[in-house]
Amino acid sequence: MDSNILVKKEESVKVNFVSTLQGKFNNAFAALSERSFRIDGMSGKAYASPNDVKIEIENFRNYKFNATVQRVFDIFIVKLSAILPHKKLETDTEYRRFQTISITLKEYMTLCNLKNKTKAIDQLRNALNIIGRIHVDFMDTIYTNKKKVEKNFCYFQIADNIARDKGKGLYYISFNIEFLRHLANSYVMPFPLQAFRIDLNRYPIAYQLCRRLTLHHNMNYFKGNANSISVKSLIDSVSLLPTHQEILKGAGQVSLRIIKPLEKVLDFLVESGILTDWHYNQQFSKKTYEQWIDSAIVFTFVDFPKRKNYNATSNDESKKVTPNIG
């Protein structure tokens, strides 16, 4: 399809949004892929440092890091977002009330439109085993007694425990108190429910791409560029795509390995009812990589929730979108 022409969605498709949290760790974690990590041959630990967030994962080679792991993590954060008070908690005792989040196998399968029970179980097991082995280290802003302060979230494991109740079909994450403190001071972000239903085997980069577009739109909602993102920013957030330098060193065409896959996924996001349309901000007489990388993508979400312009210290819970994940 000629992507200079607006791609239109079918009017019958309906999209709902849920609330999630766009914390510094969450945003960094969402942009990773297996190729983002450096693996220590002796310890088996994997290391990555996206956006000044140091991430360490134990026994990395024993599990498979992919978009499914990020999707499972985001689903737990959506469930946490539904109950975690925003910028209101102070003590560890207060945070412990919201520490453990669970999801049923049936809920996960319904949410992600999965039919194969065995594959769904494997996805949850693999994802939770990775999430339970993540250590992080980063600086971030929190609010203490309604005052904005910089806090060093110094090397800790994000989950105190992961568990499975096989009889009840339940999967649990007990988040670390420090991680909850970070999340409770993060910004709330609407997220398209349809994104969880993306077929990650057919469209492995679609989830990362959708999340990046959502983050950009939400962060710039009250600015003039909420519906426009540079191609460079977009592909930098999709670590599964090869880089221009990698293609120049090896075989293959830039158009076939970077440009076309990106356009195909943007078309898919329209067809699946997440976006209304997308197009480039300019016409290309000849689409060279240099022209393409300097261009921008203009996009429109289907029924993105309207927001009010709260100031940074607002504690108003009404800024949350009503969660609806079953």
Describe every region a protein language model picked out:
Residues M1-G326:
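Charged, alpha-helix-forming regions
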